Amino acid sequence: MKKIILSFAFALTVTSTAHAQLPVTDAGSIAQNLANHLEQMVKFAQQIEQLKQQFEEQKMQFDALTGYRGLGDILRDPTLRSYLPHNWRDLYEAVMSGGYLAAAGETANLLRKSQVYDPCASISDKDQRIACEAKVVKPVQDKVMTSKAYDATDKRLQEIESLMQEINKTGDPKAIAELQGRIESENAMIQNEDTRLHLYQQMAEAQDKLLDERQHELDAKDNARRGYPQPKALEAAY
């Protein structure tokens, strides 16, 4: 009897445990959880799209402030790089020693066009003739150099005006910055060439004095050859 009771109790225990392990399905709760999950996914997708838009806007702003627009060389005239020759001192020396033969290019052309009479042709002494020719060529050479300087500066100013017009046509900050940098570069080049022209003018004045002194020495030499009294000898006599 005791065994029967124990068996019945065990059977009840197993039955109760089996019933306790059966899952209970709540369809409403599952549907609500799924809806919440989908809503979160939609929000995540919207946030990702907003982040993409923000990234694109920041990239556009970055590109507007950086990068190369290729405007550093716009409207640049390479012939204006240096309108005064780098060897202009050598040109002066050549004129002093060669006279007409040293005149070349625009200087020679202008000399031929402007000269109505050659005051040096009748001079037989070679040194005297070359000194005479040098004094004839020198002002022509100065005019050519000064004209080049004026024309080049005028063209640079026209370039600057055109660059300023280009600035008014664009709203690109980087393009404007490049154009402004180019304008500053052109202004610096004008100042640099103006300094060179000033040095050239000083050299020209010094060259005039050298030509005058050379002519004075040649005259003294010719007077001595002819037996004429020298200026210093005359001063000493008085």
Swiss-Prot record:
The keyword Signal applies. Induction: Specifically induced within macrophages by phagosome acidification. Induced at 37 degrees Celsius in minimal medium, suggesting that nutritional stress is a regulating signal. Pfam families: T4SS (PF07996). CDD domains: VirB5_like. Keywords: Signal, Virulence. InterPro entries: T4SS_VirB5, T4SS_VirB5-domain. Residues 1-20 form the signal peptide. The keyword Signal applies. Residues 219-238 are annotated as: Disordered. Belongs to the virb5 family. The VirB system could be required for the establishment of the replication niche in the host. Transcription of the operon is maximal in early exponential phase. This is Type IV secretion system protein virB5. It comes from Brucella suis biovar 1 (strain 1330). The lineage of its organism: Bacteria, Pseudomonadati, Pseudomonadota, Alphaproteobacteria, Hyphomicrobiales. The gene is virB5.
